[in-house]
Amino acid sequence: AVLVNNPTYYGICSDLRAIVKLAHSRGIKVLTDEAHGTHLYFGENLPVCGMAAGADMSAISMHKSGGSLTQSSILLTGKAVKADHVRQIINLTQTTSASYLLLSSLDISRRNLALRGRESFARVAKMAEYARNEINSIGGYYAYGRDLVNGTSIYDYDVTKLSVYTLDIGLAGIEVYDLLRDEYDIQIEFGDICNILAYISIGDRIQDIERLVGALQDIKR
């Protein structure tokens, strides 16, 4: 099978429909790792989700952007996959004493997204776009956006992701990450050599965005 991340940690998406079409034409199944793509199933003007693109199975980490408890995820299966067989394999590789706390949180989050998912993630995308514009206006930072899309290596971009390039202010991403945590009490997702990633969720408010933007402006000084 072919395994595709959709999207990557930074929000980059491949041409998933083309990958699925090519793989299926050769009798190969496609599995999508959508650990950071739960919202793609509910958002408008977002990259295509795995199952809509024709993937055969997709693992979605509801706890990352869907609101369920940590460790809880859902495995989606398409028509070409025998769900009973998948269930048998899962039963062989995991505990038979499932956590009903985690299962309950999945069901509660599923219901919440079914009822309010579109409006919730539209608000997330709006907050991310606001943050992107504000951060880029500071100078020295670059918050990635749809301007990266080139139709090939970067086919689409997940606008709910707030990935920011920091090297031009003279600090590595991990340094900015540490400063935000230690000096401003702001815990973001991660920092690497060049970037930071702030994960905006359905639980965030515009005040949280303002705090982050203000802290980044202060750090740049």
PLM feature spans:
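Conserved PLP-enzyme active-site core in the AAT-like
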Residues: 1-148
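Conserved C-terminal alpha-helix-loop-beta "cap" of PLP-dependent enzymes
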Residues: 130, 136-221
